[in-house]
Amino acid sequence: MWKRRRGEGSDRGARGVSIAARVFLFVAAAFVVGCTGPMYLLQAGEGQLDLLCRARPIERAIRDPETPDRVRKLLSEVKSIKAFGTKFGLTPTSSYETYVALDRPRVVWVTSASDPLAFKGRKWRFPIVGSVPYLGWFDRDDARRFAEELKAEGLDVELRGASAYSTLGWFSDPVLSTMLPDGPQALSGLVDVVLHESVHATVYVAGQSTFNESLAEYVSNRLAEEYLRSHGLLAELAAIQTGRVESDRRRRRMHEAYVELNALYESSVTKEKKLAEKARILAELKKELGLSRTPNNATLLQSKTYGSQDQGFEALFERCGTWERFWKAIRTIDAGSFGGDQASKFSGVLAAAGDEACKP
């Protein structure tokens, strides 16, 4: 699997063996006890190892005459983005110093599931990351097969692509071609995703996906705007702000549907009436938001995972006053701070962190 490139020294092969061993140990520890079996372990290890094998230094990609100008320009910003993040408390890592050009539109495809008449999401538990409400697959066909297995159990299933993910500092994550979008929001999108994934490598609480994603969303939103503003990239700043207005509108509408459906599920009407009313509510949501497919309970649960607690983080930041004190407060939070796995609300946790770390 490890093929030495022309002109590279023999230490590359030794380093390859070391990285391969780390991949195996990480994936084995994280996934081997999972209920999805050895096939999930195999694809996870192979997928991660493939990325590490294909990664090349960003400087080399920039110098390569075959690298498109658009990609070259975006890659040249990565070092500056990383340095900017560390100024505001993100942990310096060796991630995003290499580049991988993928031959697919997404790096992984993510599956999640929920009961059809209750917002009760399926969870998978692993030693390193705790419980998680979704699984990622490097091969789209594998993801589809797993989604069909979940559907056969009578569950609502969501299958979506992801342009990036973080190994939480276990590996040096590369910049992926899937992280380099087209259009006027290309640079702002790259700034956002590098900062977002860097937050995960800075703070990660096992078993608390909504907390982790909401924290990353809050921090990356603030810092991405500050980065663009401080670098005089006003057109990109306007683009990202416009995009977030629309994103917030869609998220609010998703939340409204969640609240309406949750009340329906908890009511005493018959199962048949619940299913009929659910179909009506979701059909309206699809039409209003212009979705390509009808959403379901798993879709709405995933929507709640990202950015659903921004007000709590904003209140904590205002109380702490500086990024240094904000991160000090965040680092007082661990798995024991929550009442159980996958808490959907944690304003009390954030308030307690402020009490401990940001006293007047």
Regions found by a protein language model. Give the residues of each.
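Bacterial N-terminal signal peptides that target proteins for export
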Residues: 5, 11-24
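Bacterial N-terminal signal peptides
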Residues: 22-34
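Bacterial Sec signal peptide processing site at the extreme N-terminus
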Residues: 34-56
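Soluble non-cytosolic domains of exported or imported proteins
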Residues: 52, 65-79, 137-141, 184-193, ...
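Acidic/histidine-rich, surface-exposed loop or edge segments in extracytoplasmic proteins
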Residues: 52-66, 124-132
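Sec-exported extracytoplasmic/periplasmic mature domains
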Residues: 63-67, 79-90, 199-203, 220-232, ...
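Acidic/His-rich structured neighborhood in mature extracellular/periplasmic domains
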Residues: 80-247
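Pan-zinc metallopeptidase signature
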Residues: 251-360
